[in-house]
UniProtKB/Swiss-Prot annotation:
Pfam families: DNA_gyraseB (PF00204), DNA_gyraseB_C (PF00986), GyrB_hook (PF21249), GyrB_insert (PF18053), HATPase_c (PF02518), Toprim (PF01751). A type II topoisomerase that negatively supercoils closed circular double-stranded (ds) DNA in an ATP-dependent manner to modulate DNA topology and maintain chromosomes in an underwound state. Negative supercoiling favors strand separation, and DNA replication, transcription, recombination and repair, all of which involve strand separation. Also able to catalyze the interconversion of other topological isomers of dsDNA rings, including catenanes and knotted rings. Type II topoisomerases break and join 2 DNA strands simultaneously in an ATP-dependent manner. Heterotetramer, composed of two GyrA and two GyrB chains. In the heterotetramer, GyrA contains the active site tyrosine that forms a transient covalent intermediate with DNA, while GyrB binds cofactors and catalyzes ATP hydrolysis. It comes from Neisseria gonorrhoeae (strain ATCC 700825 / FA 1090). The gene is gyrB. One of its GO terms (cellular component) is cytoplasm. GO terms for biological process: DNA topological change; DNA-templated DNA replication. This is DNA gyrase subunit B. Mg(2+) 1 binds at residues 427, 501. Few gyrases are as efficient as E.coli at forming negative supercoils. Not all organisms have 2 type II topoisomerases; in organisms with a single type II topoisomerase this enzyme also has to decatenate newly replicated chromosomes.
């Protein structure tokens, strides 16, 4: 597939089709949604895809992606380097043409790229058009070339800035704030895509670095699509150890596929064309399903497996518990839309059919133990499908499936247009009663749910239908259930709002409902129909004022606002008040939160001392000793002992030993911690506090004067004064609110807060549901331990 990779890739290879004018007017057509973050991350993917195309052509094996502290992103590869010669038609460097002209690129010239991820000549010029600035550094022909663009226009022509024996291209860009509502990148979203690319392109080392918090991950993932399947199944229980793998080429097209069954009831298939994911599958997936059904059925019939089990197997049975990655590569792929979510190239079908048929037949014949396990799983699925069919008929007769008889517990709304209707799923009859009284019955329906609904992660379909609460929910929604029956067009409400108590039981019920929607009605999540209500956690009374506060953070911020009213600190003749006092107080409270979270890993006394110390440097023994001396000087010798430890390969640590209640507590300050966002917060706070408040300082709050020899003392006094005469009530349940309060805080569209449920990484989401709701205890315990620090509002 890369037989033409040695063809000349120069200025003559770049073809120009049209200009950039339309991009800035309608960026969504080219890059996706510019407000929800998807378009922003797609900017990185466009540049990254260019580097991957160099790897596909056999010219690149190292790619580095960096999120910089100024929110710019750079993508560097060690490929051939963009062409730097003068373009014959445009009269300027080919690199400038690629960056400034839409549809200019080597992807339209089959000599330069035989296979590429669609028409990516669009990509990098669109990134340039939608960025405040772009810098392009090219290492080619023993020289380093540089050019800078501002809002899509060349600042000055490409120039040689020095000699270099490197080769490759580095693109760095700052996304335009006029186009994008938010330019905050998610490390996890970028990591998900890079992980896919690493599995799909053996031999390419991709590194992702986040300079904002020092996070770094290297993706040199081996195993190809088989390794990808193993990764997807790592939190599940595979039924057979050996992974099915197939690879074949024909007529310039290639098919690569890996499959492994696990003990779950869900199918998990990832499809790719030229490294681009297809969320909606397409001709390659259709062909795979057909050939898989035909081949496995032939094996089952030949070995009389179904006959002995007295069941008839179908295609759906074969996909229950299947984890599969299918990757096809072909020239000029055709998709159903600009988003490339569905492949429509018909020519790939016969190739998939031929490759999989032979490989799967051989796999089943040569691995009888695996074949027995897989066919046994399929027979079990067929039996369950038959039981589910009978259960479905019973429930249909009861009116559950078709929604003819609405449940008596449902307080429906008057509105008949689903787009204008809301359904609140409320925990308990008490809160349900308050919600029914407080709602706007014109468009708000209420369905109280009694107790905890069935955990569908562990239950087969027929058991789920037998659950009264689940059956009631299915009936109320009106869209049916199951592959044959579910129809989202029949859904009676386009806003389904989960409203539970702010305690552990409420969180559990919310998780059970999310599991139900994710596993049984994922399209409702994809369409953005599922929401989580945000009832307030606190009600504060201060004099005649009454205020509802969403969570701990909002409570602290509100208290801080009251504390700082008419407050000032006078130290060494300098007055600290207004915005300066407020900013410093917020920074200090943030540091306190960090100390609380990080004290699990680093001694709390030492973390507090860091607020009064210089930044710690462990790059040399001398600097590490200085840090030990300074921190020790801020602590009582009886409290903690610090010492420098020399580790492997020049790594240094500071060991902290402290006695507490007769126990010896040991923790470490490591380089990883010093590169974290948490430590950045502590050093920023230390810088803000340095020399701010000294001995003899005075705090004034209104008419009152207090002694305050540190900022922490002053803030403690202010917060204590603010809470005098105030009562703060913590709501444990929705039933504690009367109907008017529930409407005012949680149901009134003018003031309420709703969280929309979205899935950004399907594989990660699948893992979370398997971990939290599955049968395995150890992964769940590990998950809870690892995430305990970031959990909020957990009952003591």
């Amino acid at each position: 597939m890369t037989e033409q990779k040695h063809e000349e890739y120069g200025a003559d290879s770049i073809q120009v089709l049209e200009g950039l004018e339309a991009v800035r007017k309608r960026p969504g057509m080219y890059i996706g949604d510019t407000q929800d973050g998807s378009g922003l991350h797609h900017m990185v993917f466009e540049v990254l895809d260019n580097a991957i195309d160099e790897a596909l052509a056999g010219h690149c094996d190292k790619i580095t992606v960096t999120i910089h502290a100024d929110h710019s992103v750079s993508v560097a590869d060690n490929g051939r380097g963009m062409p730097t010669g003068i373009h014959p038609k445009e009269g300027r460097s080919a690199a400038e043409v690629i960056m400034t002209v839409l549809h200019a690129g080597g992807k339209f010239d089959n000599n330069s790229y035989k296979i590429s991820g669609g028409l990516h000549g669009v990509g990098v010029s669109v990134v340039n058009a939608l960025s405040d600035w772009v810098t392009l550094t090219i290492y080619r022909d023993g020289k380093e070339h540089f050019v800078r663009f501002v809002r899509g226009e060349t600042e000055e022509p490409l120039k040689i800035v020095g000699d270099s024996d490197k080769k490759g291209t580095t693109v760095r860009f700052l996304a335009g704030t006029e186009t994008f509502g938010n330019i905050e990148y998610s490390f996890d979203i970028l990591a998900k895509r890079i992980r896919e690319l690493s599995f799909l392109n053996n031999g390419v080392d991709i590194e992702l670095t986040d300079e904002r918090d020092g996070k770094h991950e290297s993706f040199a993932l081996s195993g190809g699509v088989a390794g990808f399947v193993q990764y997807m199944n790592r939190k599940k229980t595979p039924l057979h150890e050996k992974i099915f793998y197939a690879f074949g080429e024909k007529d310039g097209m290639s098919v690569e596929c890996a499959m492994q069954w696990n003990d779950s009831y869900q199918e998990s298939v990832q499809c790719f064309t030229n490294n681009i994911p297809q969320r909606d599958g397409g001709t390659h997936l259709t062909a795979l399903r057909q050939v898989m059904t035909r081949t496995i059925n032939s094996y089952i019939e030949a070995n009389e497996v179904a006959k002995k089990a007295k069941v008839e197997t179908a295609g759906d049975d074969m996909r229950e518990g299947l984890t599969c990655v299918l990757s096809v590569k072909l020239p000029d792929p055709k998709f159903s839309s600009q988003t490339k979510d569905k492949l429509v190239s018909g020519e790939i079908g016969p190739v998939v059919n031929e490759v999989i048929n032979q490989a799967l037949t051989d796999f089943l014949e040569e691995n009888p133990n695996e074949a027995k396990i897989i066919t046994g799983k399929i027979v079990d699925a067929a039996r369950a499908r038959e039981a589910a069919r009978k259960a479905r008929e019973i429930t249909r007769r009861k009116g559950v499936m078709d929604g003819l008889g609405l449940p008596g517990k449902l307080a429906d709304c008057q509105e008949k247009d689903p787009a204008l209707s809301e359904l609140y799923l409320v925990e308990g009859d008490s809160a349900g009663g308050s919600a029914m009284q407080g709602r706007d019955r014109k468009f708000q329906a209420i369905l109280p749910l009694k107790g905890k609904i069935l955990n569908v992660e562990k239950a087969r379909f027929e058991k789920m239908l037998a659950s009264q609460e689940v059956a009631t929910l299915i009936t109320a929604l009106g869209a049916g259930i199951g592959k044959e029956e579910f129809n989202p067009e029949k859904l009676r409400y386009h806003r389904i709002i989960i409203m539970t108590d702010a305690d552990v039981d409420g969180a559990h019920i919310r998780t059970l409902l999310l599991t139900f929607f994710y596993r049984q009605m994922p399209e409702l999540v994809e369409r953005g129909y599922i929401y989580i209500a945000q009832p307030p956690l606190y009600k504060a009374k201060y004099g005649k004022q009454e205020r509802y506060l969403k969570d701990e953070l909002e409570k602290d911020q509100w208290l801080l606002g009251l504390a700082l009213e008419k407050a000032k600190i006078v130290s060494d003749g300098r007055t600290i008040e207004g915005a300066e006092l407020a900013d410093t107080a917020k920074q200090f409270l943030l540091a306190k939160t960090v100390i609380e979270q990080e004290s699990r890993f680093v001694d709390e006394l030492v973390l507090r001392a860091m607020l009064h110390a210089s930044p710690i440097d462990l790059t040399s023994s001398e600097n590490a000793d200085k840090a030990v001396a300074e921190l020790s000087g801020l602590l009582d010798e009886k409290e903690a002992a610090l010492e420098r430890i020399e580790g492997h390969e020049g790594h240094r640590f500071i060991k902290i030993t402290r006695k507490l209640h007769g126990n010896v507590m040991v923790s470490y300050i490591e380089p990883k911690f010093l590169n974290s966002k948490a430590y950045q917060t502590l050093t920023q706070t230390a810088a803000a506090l340095k020399g701010l408040v000294g001995e003899g300082a005075k705090l004034y709050k209104g008419e009152n004067e207090y002694d305050a020899d540190s900022f922490e003392t002053a803030l403690d006094i202010l917060m204590s004064v603010a809470q005098k005469g105030m009562s703060i009530q913590r709501y444990k349940g929705l039933g504690e609110m009367n109907p008017e309060q529930l409407w005012e805080t949680t149901m009134d569209p003018a003031v309420r807060r709703l969280l929309k449920v979205r899935i950004e990484d399907a594989i990660a989401a699948d893992e979370v549901f398997v971990t939290l709701m599955g049968d395995e205890v150890e992964p769940r315990r590990a998950f809870i331990e690892n995430n305990a620090l970031i959990a909020q509002n957990i009952d003591a």
